[in-house]
Amino acid sequence: MGGSSDSDSHDGYLTSEYNSSNSLFSLNTGNSYSSASLDRATLDCQDSVFFDNHKSSLLSTEVPRFISNDPLHLPITLNYKRDNADPTYTNGKVNKFMIVLIGLPATGKSTISSHLIQCLKNNPLTNSLRCKVFNAGKIRRQISCATISKPLLLSNTSSEDLFNPKNNDKKETYARITLQKLFHEINNDECDVGIFDATNSTIERRRFIFEEVCSFNTDELSSFNLVPIILQVSCFNRSFIKYNIHNKSFNEDYLDKPYELAIKDFAKRLKHYYSQFTPFSLDEFNQIHRYISQHEEIDTSLFFFNVINAGVVEPHSLNQSHYPSTCGKQIRDTIMVIENFINHYSQMFGFEYIEAVKLFFESFGNSSEETLTTLDSVVNDKFFDDLQSLIESNGFA
């Protein structure tokens, strides 16, 4: 179990000969929803030996990791009595947490954030934390519906297309409104963990986010200190991407749209995002940490984690943690739970997702063949080739 031949090593996957985080974003040719690819992904979730046997073909790393046979019952959750008399302070303020999601649409960011909340709630180390997701897309839809009383209007020109790079200012406005809502509710003690759910796909957007975090933490009027955690969600399995695009065609933007129109519009939207996307890297992590330390004038906490292909690909050499010398128990406990969630995601949740993808493609032979034909006509080899070209034009292949 866990072995594969060279002939199927990239079947249905995006290439992943790892030198840096950027190399994750590279497409290869192959069956978009090959049964062999999905079966292999299923086995990968079940087989801990897979990660050691395939380091060179997935993510090259010399750091081994123990995978528990029972990831839902991990040692850190046992025999622990929470010490509520030991709060952690930074700059004289009680700490709260902000998780910044990064990732292209249709990679699973929202699903993974809901799984993370479930994990935090089920662990005695963190079950007292109040968690809330702040989704920029939902804020956009709320504002749009309040303004025009309609779902998303599909555009015919680049000037009307919200997701066209020419209209970045509009997207940035919605993101800033969402971010300010997160700060407001954190400051009013309405939640303890705020998850900023947006693509956050450019260096400029991320720079703005952390400038705002610094401003919040150094503002004398703010009641709490935010500990930033970066969670990048990536997907380079063609079957997963295709399945996710199918599901996106049923979200709130497309409730009143025909299936084919929804698929075409979302595929176009995805190309726009690929044309601007810059993966978060360790260099950017270090730059942000230096920036925060300089502006907050203290050695501050900063953490970076990755979930790749529903957790099947091991991101060991990408993850990064910085604990200041004065880091308290609350931060260490919370990060330990999150890190454990990341390390065991494929076994805790990924297997179920991969099985759903397999069932989706297998079931078309018995039911909605027209739907699959429509999906194939849009999300095909040419579509993935176009995405690859966009990646290469950005210098991230």
UniProtKB/Swiss-Prot annotation:
Pfam families in UniProt: 6PF2K (PF01591)
Entry annotation: catalytic residues: D197, C235
Catalyzed reactions per annotation: beta-D-fructose 6-phosphate + ATP = beta-D-fructose 2,6-bisphosphate + ADP + H(+)
Keyword Repeat appears in the UniProt entry: no
Keyword Membrane: no
Residues reported to bind ATP: G103, L104, P105, A106, T107, G108, K109, S110
GO terms for biological process, alphabetical: fructose 2,6-bisphosphate metabolic process; fructose metabolic process; regulation of glycolytic process
Induction per the UniProt record: By glucose and fructose, but not by galactose or maltose.
Keyword field: ATP-binding, Isopeptide bond, Kinase, Nucleotide-binding, Transferase, Ubl conjugation
GO MF, one annotated term: 6-phosphofructo-2-kinase activity
Any one annotated GO CC term: cytosol
Region (6-phosphofructo-2-kinase), start-end ranges: 85-305
Binding site for beta-D-fructose 6-phosphate: R269
Disulphides: none
Enzyme Commission code: 2.7.1.105
Cross-link Glycyl lysine isopeptide (Lys-Gly) (interchain with G-Cter in ubiquitin), where in sequence: K55
Biological role stated in the UniProt entry: Synthesis of fructose 2,6-bisphosphate.
Name the record gives this protein: 6-phosphofructo-2-kinase 2
Lineage, highest ranks first: Eukaryota, Fungi, Dikarya, Ascomycota, Saccharomycotina
Protein's gene: PFK27
